[in-house]
């Protein structure tokens, strides 16, 4: 009987640890999606580079605005918004653009971890 009680306590303890973690993850993902929808395909400034996001089947992907494989600086955000510009997705590392991976990580963290 004591064994059954200990097993029951174990499952209650695990349940109380896992469920809040899952709900916190879902809350954070929902907040990121709301931030994504609020951007409405406009660019944001991250590390003096213009980033935007696309919602794909594998989730939200960050992309950087480029002109001839050179990231467009934040000072040109008014010229770039709502226009067709070339973009590079952050799913692959680019050695020809210095600091590309760091800026991509920051773009994701700005979307998911804003407070």
Curated annotation (Swiss-Prot):
It is a single-pass type III membrane protein. It holds the Pfam family Pox_A21. Contains two intramolecular disulfide bonds. They are created by the viral disulfide bond formation pathway, a poxvirus-specific pathway that operates on the cytoplasmic side of the MV membranes. It comes from the Viruses. One of its GO terms (biological process) is membrane fusion involved in viral entry into host cell. The chain crosses the membrane at residues 1-21. InterPro entries: Poxvirus_A21. The keyword Zinc-finger does not apply. It is found in: Virion membrane. GO terms for cellular component: membrane; viral envelope; virion membrane. Keywords: Disulfide bond, Fusion of virus membrane with host membrane, Membrane, Phosphoprotein, Signal-anchor, Transmembrane, Transmembrane helix, Viral envelope protein, Viral penetration into host cytoplasm, Virion, Virus entry into host cell. The keyword Disulfide bond applies. Belongs to the orthopoxvirus OPG147 family. Part of a stable entry-fusion complex (EFC) which is at least composed of proteins OPG143, OPG147, OPG155, OPG086, OPG094, OPG107, OPG104, and OPG099. Formation of the viral membrane is necessary for the assembly of the complex. Envelope protein part of the entry-fusion complex responsible for the virus membrane fusion with host cell membrane during virus entry. Also plays a role in cell-cell fusion (syncytium formation). This is Virion membrane protein OPG147. It comes from Monkeypox virus.
């Amino acid at each position: 009987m004591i064994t059954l009680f200990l097993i029951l306590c174990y499952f209650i303890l695990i349940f109380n640890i896992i469920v809040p973690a899952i709900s916190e993850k879902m809350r954070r993902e929902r907040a990121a999606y709301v931030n994504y929808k609020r951007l409405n395909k406009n660019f944001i400034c991250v590390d003096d580079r213009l980033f935007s996001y696309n919602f794909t089947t594998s989730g939200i992907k960050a992309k950087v605005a480029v002109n001839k494989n050179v990231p467009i600086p934040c000072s040109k955000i008014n010229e770039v918004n709502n226009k067709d510009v070339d973009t590079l997705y952050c799913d692959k590392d680019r050695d020809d653009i210095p600091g590309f991976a760091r800026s991509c990580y920051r773009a994701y963290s700005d979307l998911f971890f804003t407070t």
